Amino acid sequence: MAIWQGTSKRKSTGAKLRLVTKKHKREMGRPAVETHISAVIKRKIVRCRGANLKVKLEKTNYANVFDQVNKVCKKVLVTKVIDNKANKHYIRRNVITKGAIIETEMGKAKVTSRPGQDGVVNAVLLSE
């Protein structure tokens, strides 16, 4: 069944609303892509509104980490997810989202991009 992101057919009290318009295709949504750590890099290209393309990152083990002290950006290997404020179960499942703290070859880094929407993992190295 499709995900519909329009307004509800009912009020907060439970009474039915009189809808002015019917459901439109533009109000449809998709299930979220949860980016996992894996040796195989897998991307999904999806057509969006306006015939644009969106790259969704499904699996990866690399991240672009920026070192603020040395002003250097490197592509490094991601080993695991240390903390994720989005969902506590994402830590166990190694799901990368924006704001997640990941363990890399350079050290701990905080993810600044949205991998499920951008198709790449960008992160900033945390000073310890």
Swiss-Prot record:
MF-aspect GO terms: structural constituent of ribosome
Gene Ontology BP annotations: translation
InterPro entries documented for this protein: Ribosomal_eS8 (IPR001047), Ribosomal_protein_eS8_arc (IPR020919), Ribosomal_Se8/biogenesis_NSA2 (IPR022309)
Keyword Ribosomal protein recorded: yes
Keyword Ribosomal protein: yes
Domain of life: Archaea
Keywords of this entry: Ribonucleoprotein, Ribosomal protein
Pfam families according to UniProt: Ribosomal_S8e
GO cellular component terms attached to this protein's record: ribonucleoprotein complex; ribosome
Family to which the UniProt record says this protein belongs: Belongs to the eukaryotic ribosomal protein eS8 family.
SUBUNIT field: Part of the 30S ribosomal subunit.
PANTHER family documented for this protein: 40S RIBOSOMAL PROTEIN S8 (PTHR10394)
Name of the featured protein: Small ribosomal subunit protein eS8
Organism: Methanococcus vannielii (strain ATCC 35089 / DSM 1224 / JCM 13029 / OCM 148 / SB)
